[in-house]
Amino acid sequence: GSYDPELNLVYWGTGNPGPDWNGDVREGDNLYADSVLALDGDTGEMSWYFQFTPHDEHDWDAIQVPVLADIDLDGETRKAMLWANRNGFYYTLDRETGEFLLGKPFAKQTWAEGLDENGRPIRRPDTSPSQEGTLVAPIAGGGTNWWSPAFSPRTNLMYVNAFDGEALFFSREQEYNEGDNFTGGGTETGAQAPHRVKRRHPPPADVALGLAGPAVHGDIHGAVGATEQKE
């Protein structure tokens, strides 16, 4: 999560609903899953929320790190929240009110036509998991995942680790038993669902930025790399 001391708001992302891949047993938007919650720093009361993926059927939780930045948008300085979401879309929100300001894909996605004026996804038909398997991008791992992104006020660019990939999503009926894995399906990659990963510096990890220096990033093997910031 992130904290704005001026607004005294804590911003926290939430996980996906369960079962992950069988949405038939949990109708509706499934609030407040796959959302960012703005919580009062003193009381914990919710000031506002924004749901990235209503009725998520692909395990695209919203546990990415929200980046807080003051940006110029349409000639006006806005207190913004920048969020590259696991569902493959990038969002800019007003962090005071939760208003959706803009959004667009940053990774390969085939499940939505785009976002409406309120930031709600316009779903494509026949993209829900099925018994036979439904080919959808991004994969369950998402267009990005847990790794921290970064924002440079010098270049006005967001730096994020991104994946391009697609998978077959399967659904099945499953009874809930306390303590058991409750997924209601699964995913598969292979010849029919090539798991293509695109990244400039593999494998991914957090990204850190200095005021004028390069974007510094690590990998799961303990190596550290640096990439020049380009405007």
Residue ranges and their predicted role:
Residues 2-231:
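Beta-sheet-rich non-transmembrane sensory/scaffold domains
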